[in-house]
Amino acid sequence: MLDIQLFRKDIDAVAQRLATRGFQLDVAAFQALEAERKQLQTQTEELQARRNSLSKQIGMLKGKGEDASAVMAEVGGIGDTLKASAARLDEIQAHLGELMLSIPNLPHESVPVGNDETQNVEVRRVGEPRQFDFAVRDHVDVGEKLGLDFDTAVKVTGSRFSMLRGGMARLHRALVQLMLDTHTQEHGYTEMYVPYIVNAASMRGTGQLPKFEEDLFKVPRKVGSEEGERIENFYLIPTAEVPLTNIVRDAIVAGDKLPLRFVAHTPCFRSEAGSYGKDTRGMIRQHQFDKVELVQVVPADQSFDALEQLTGHAEAILKKLELPFRTIVLCTGDMGFGSTKTYDLEVWIPAQNTYREISSCSNMGDFQARRMQARMRTGQGKPELVHTLNGSGLAVGRTLVAILENYQNADGSVTVPAALQPYMGGTTRLEPEL
């Protein structure tokens, strides 16, 4: 959530920056709410001053033994007006709060201005795509002979799910172990095991609610209280960013404890409500997929350096796996809702003859921290909002896809990348099942 003082100071400048990311701020609606809020607050202050003055008069009149009923009646009337004003002011504040929750983050000045993904800017490429001397097969054709099973997953659950068997399942696990070991042992992250179901407050804190509710899997639950039963909504996590970042919700962290670096391996659950017809074949776009997530909590003046660092941590996994990739900076029109700057890592997918996203690394600035009231304190100073960052380190399923395609052999086998062989008991190749 953005600082409302930015809007009160120069709403036109804010609207212009938001427009670069395709968001049209309803300036008139905001200004109308603000005008009424100011009018109500002024009226309330004047009425409170009048009531205080009259209350003193009542005391003086009673002290003299004089009739104070008229003044008391006026005080009673002021009280009724104040109650009505307070109720309306609460409504105005609620409307302003809802409006602020619906507004995305401001792009950083270093972000290229653009309308969509076609205007993202490539920063660097690492590795050269392999030249095959045989017809390249996609990960579905390669994987189904090695233990990648879509048919059983469809029977058990439905479309956009998959099962892994034998060597494929082991390769998937090896990827997770490599990622966690690298991030904890080389990059200084603390490994966390987190809930896969979170409450609505956590989803609001990181920005999934209220805007993206249709993309989430909701878990309604009956909760009992003295007033009776009510339904409380919980949610399957779309990313470990949600529970990891909410660790600091409603907390004041000592400045000397920062930066905090968390990593977690979790399944992620997404309804893909807006993805009908996209990537219907294979593992690229699933309702359930595994991801190793990186989260950092840092002081405000360190967040952009931390973004470069975090992006490098994700890149390190691709380098270890010797997978060709490129890093791009997203333009204003392609950034996520809460991000002020984002780098995407895209891995080479031979069968598609293109690069596909495998990690997104974002600096959220104080956008999430303001929603969560996540703060830091240095010495005896006043609490200040922290900055939060997150990134995939990496999406496990898409990394598996990249390995199946880039390391495939003419006989249908897949060479196990050298970095994974210690996690595979020395296995160097996955052979087609008999």
From Swiss-Prot:
Enzyme class: ligase
GO-annotated molecular function: ATP binding; serine-tRNA ligase activity
Main location: cytoplasm
The protein's name in its UniProt record: Serine--tRNA ligase
A GO-annotated cellular component: cytoplasm
Keywords: Aminoacyl-tRNA synthetase, ATP-binding, Cytoplasm, Ligase, Nucleotide-binding, Protein biosynthesis
Signal sequence interval, chain numbering: none
Domain notes: Consists of two distinct domains, a catalytic core and a N-terminal extension that is involved in tRNA binding.
Pfam families, A to Z: Seryl_tRNA_N, tRNA-synt_2b
EC number from the UniProt entry: 6.1.1.11
Biological pathway: Aminoacyl-tRNA biosynthesis; selenocysteinyl-tRNA(Sec) biosynthesis; L-seryl-tRNA(Sec) from L-serine and tRNA(Sec): step 1/1
Organism listed in the record: Cupriavidus taiwanensis (strain DSM 17343 / BCRC 17206 / CCUG 44338 / CIP 107171 / LMG 19424 / R1)
Annotated compartments: Cytoplasm
Positions in coiled-coil regions: none
Binding positions for L-serine per the UniProt entry: 239-241, 293, 392
